[in-house]
A protein has these predicted regions:
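HotDog/MaoC-like acyl-thioester-processing domains
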Residues: 1-15, 93, 97-102, 106-150
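Hot-dog-fold acyl-thioester-processing enzymes
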Residues: 1-86, 150
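Short beta-strand or tight-loop elements
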Residues: 84, 89, 105
């Protein structure tokens, strides 16, 4: 079954609802494009020799790229229920992501707060997990979600 958590309206979401997305592999081309686009030329992302001398022994993927890909995995492009991204809290990168790692998103509703007649703020546990089951990016995503039209 495809990921549908953020296709639901505010009233249909329940604390504890959880889903896992499809996976995607992060390639060297992804890292090069991201670093070029953003200007993030930090040596651990771009310099193989420097990275081999580092704590990680090889190049790592920029954390912001991992977070950006999590939105691509977890936010449906045609969603009519998401009114706005309200923010991200408690962002952490507890383990490195390496080139050629395959990641997926594990999302769960942790809290709902009524806002107004149009909808409410939903807080989701937003964890990116690699092919080994290791969480590489953990955060709380806050989304303004529409109420049902009925």
């Amino acid at each position: 079954m495809p990921y549908q958590l953020l296709e639901r309206d505010y009233d249909a979401l329940t604390v504890g609802d959880a889903e896992v997305t499809r996976a995607r592999t992060i390639t060297e081309a992804d890292v090069v494009a991201f670093c070029t686009l953003t200007g993030d030329m930090f040596a651990l992302h771009t310099d193989r020799v420097a990275a081999e001398r580092s704590l990680f022994r090889r190049r790592i993927v920029p954390g912001m790229l991992v977070l950006a890909y999590s939105y691509g995995l977890g936010v449906p492009p045609g969603s009519s229920t998401i009114l706005a991204n309200y923010g991200t809290d408690a962002l952490r990168f507890p383990a490195p992501t390496f080139i050629d790692d395959t990641i997926h998103l594990e999302a769960a509703v942790e809290e709902k707060r009524e806002r107004d007649a149009r909808g409410g703020i939903v807080t989701l546990r937003w964890d990116v997990v690699n092919q080994n089951g290791t969480t590489v990016c953990a955060s709380k995503l806050l989304v303004l979600v529409a109420r049902s039209a009925a």
